[in-house]
């Protein structure tokens, strides 16, 4: 049993990118599905699909690679707010990842969204991860 499903998801994506895997399987929870939707909206993955096998459900992510050398579109993915140390940010002090070239996924009262969307909607929340 994994305690931190978000960190588990990010680690699986990181490992699959290093091994140049096309598809990665992740345990399905509401949060992992929401993160996958944000990644799809930001065009960092090709697609995702829910798989239900009896009692266990999983999420299949199709990772995105570019060019002949198959460079992953997700170069670095890093967990920020952890179960032992939560990190929150208001709408005014929302962090910019790599000066705006990266993306932060924020958990707000309006659901999961990127830092740019949170700034536009003027909402703050918990900073889940940074993606570059």
UniProtKB/Swiss-Prot annotation:
Signal peptide: none annotated. It is found in: Plastid, Chloroplast. One of its GO terms (cellular component) is chloroplast. GO terms for biological process: translation. Its main location: plastid. InterPro entries: Ribosomal_uS8 (IPR000630), Ribosomal_uS8_CS (IPR047863), Ribosomal_uS8_sf (IPR035987). The keyword Zinc does not apply. Keywords: Chloroplast, Plastid, Ribonucleoprotein, Ribosomal protein, RNA-binding, rRNA-binding. GO terms for molecular function: rRNA binding; structural constituent of ribosome. Pfam families: Ribosomal_S8 (PF00410). One of the primary rRNA binding proteins, it binds directly to 16S rRNA central domain where it helps coordinate assembly of the platform of the 30S subunit. Part of the 30S ribosomal subunit. Belongs to the universal ribosomal protein uS8 family. This is Small ribosomal subunit protein uS8c. The gene is rps8.
